[in-house]
């Protein structure tokens, strides 16, 4: 199927993918006077008297803003807010179709972190949560961290944490397949940008102790003096053996390779230098860091990619619909590390011992159990950590 042609036809014929659907009928004078003036003034008065009643009388409790400035859209780069709108519409569709969460795409003409922060704070009263999307690094770090501190609704940068949660879920099961433990394995991550950094943080939360991050200049280590602040931080908290060099040196004896970088950077020969029963997650799209057959030829036992035409697809849609559903259901103030880890285990545990195998470490995108399992786990973790208001 020619997906490019099909996508153009879909978007043109429907004039986009989302619209507004009224929940109430306005067919009589009484309907009009109830839905709008004068009747509408009464819920306004109630909310004025008790601002929390906005959740009772409006759509806020199940409505997420999908916010982007279009500076890092898919593999297209900085294409601007207008060109990024089809992606944000798509995100809204997935939130609704998979999680039952209403969402509205908002593409803003704002490049600096300060402008994006100001825009999100200005619209926050309308929404129960904010999904940040396709905002370039390093600005995305400051934007998310600031909004998390200053807003009382959950803010979630899916490019970072959605990827990290699903990778963690997949690795939990991959390690179960090969009989290794998170705290014992040597992990190499290639590409410590927004997603890569979040993956490292998530794996550390899950118990990983030996992670080496590798960028285009080589391994990150204490005193590596990177021009990017988050990489200097990674150099301080990872690479306990202070391995220096490039990907070749980092991979010697490694148990796990995680790539969020560029096509073809991992070779069969490099895979052969890894530990027995190696695990490779090659998630560059559309062409991964190494193709599955090449990795298997190098002795890799468990392989995952971001593609739907290979086994073990690492797909964010397994995470964000259920995560927002769960967070909104308890009116969470935040999405914290414990909620993210709960989501990862909820996804992983859907694959039973009997079903788990080298080519089945993560549920499929259309598994109907996923969103509710994630929502339940996230809601409980929110209660356990004191960020739930219900």
Language-model features: where?
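N-terminal ligand-binding/catalytic initiation module
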Residues: 1-155, 375, 380-381, 385-389
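Short, ordered loop/turn segments at secondary-structure junctions
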Residues: 69-71, 79, 108-109, 134-137, ...
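Glycine-rich phosphate/diphosphate-binding loop of Rossmann-like nucleotide-binding domains
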Residues: 74, 79-99, 151, 157, ...
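Solvent-exposed alpha-helices and their adjacent loops that cap or buttress functional pockets
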Residues: 55-60, 96-97, 122-124, 148-149, ...
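General beta-strand structural signal in soluble alpha/beta enzymes
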Residues: 105, 131-134, 155-158, 189, ...
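Rossmann-like adenosine-cofactor binding region
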Residues: 232-301, 307-309
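Adenosine-phosphate binding glycine-rich loop
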Residues: 158-159, 178, 282-390
């Amino acid at each position: 199927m020619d997906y490019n042609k099909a996508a153009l036809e879909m978007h043109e014929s429907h004039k986009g993918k989302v619209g507004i659907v009224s929940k109430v009928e306005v067919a009589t004078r009484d309907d009009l006077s109830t839905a709008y003036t004068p009747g509408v003034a009464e819920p306004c008065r109630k909310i004025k008297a008790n601002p929390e009643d906005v959740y009772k009388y409006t759509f806020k409790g199940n409505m997420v803003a999908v916010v982007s400035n279009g500076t890092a859209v898919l593999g297209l780069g900085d294409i601007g807010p207008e060109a990024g709108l089809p992606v944000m519409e798509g995100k809204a569709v997935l939130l609704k179709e998979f999680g039952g969460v209403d969402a509205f795409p908002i593409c803003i003409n704002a490049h600096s972190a300060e402008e994006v922060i100001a825009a999100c704070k200005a619209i926050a009263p309308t929404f129960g949560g904010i999904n940040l999307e396709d905002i370039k690094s390093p600005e995305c770090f400051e934007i998310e961290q600031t909004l998390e501190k200053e807003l009382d609704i959950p803010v979630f940068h899916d490019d970072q944490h959605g990827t990290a949660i699903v990778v963690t879920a997949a690795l939990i099961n991959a390690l179960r397949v090969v009989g290794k433990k998170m705290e014992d394995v040597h992990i190499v991550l290639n590409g410590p940008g927004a997603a890569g950094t979040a993956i490292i943080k998530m794996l550390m939360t899950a118990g990983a102790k030996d992670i080496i991050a590798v960028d285009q200049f080589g391994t990150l280590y204490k005193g590596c003096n990177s021009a990017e602040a988050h990489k200097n931080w990674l150099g301080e908290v990872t690479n306990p053996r202070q391995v220096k060099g490039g990907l070749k040196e980092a991979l010697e004896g490694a148990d796990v390779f995680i790539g969020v970088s560029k096509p073809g950077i991992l070779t069969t020969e490099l895979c052969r230098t890894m530990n027995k029963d190696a695990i490779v997650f090659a998630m560059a799209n559309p062409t991964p860091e190494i193709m599955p057959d090449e990795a298997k030829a190098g002795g890799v036992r468990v392989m995952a990619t971001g593609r739907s035409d290979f086994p073990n697809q690492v797909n964010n849609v397994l995470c964000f619909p259920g995560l927002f559903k769960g967070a909104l259901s308890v009116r969470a103030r935040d999405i914290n590390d414990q909620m993210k880890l709960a989501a990862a285990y909820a996804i992983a545990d859907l694959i039973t011992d009997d079903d788990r195998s080298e080519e089945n470490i993560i549920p499929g995108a259309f598994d109907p159990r996923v969103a509710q399992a994630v929502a339940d786990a996230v809601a409980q973790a929110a209660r356990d950590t004191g960020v739930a208001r219900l």
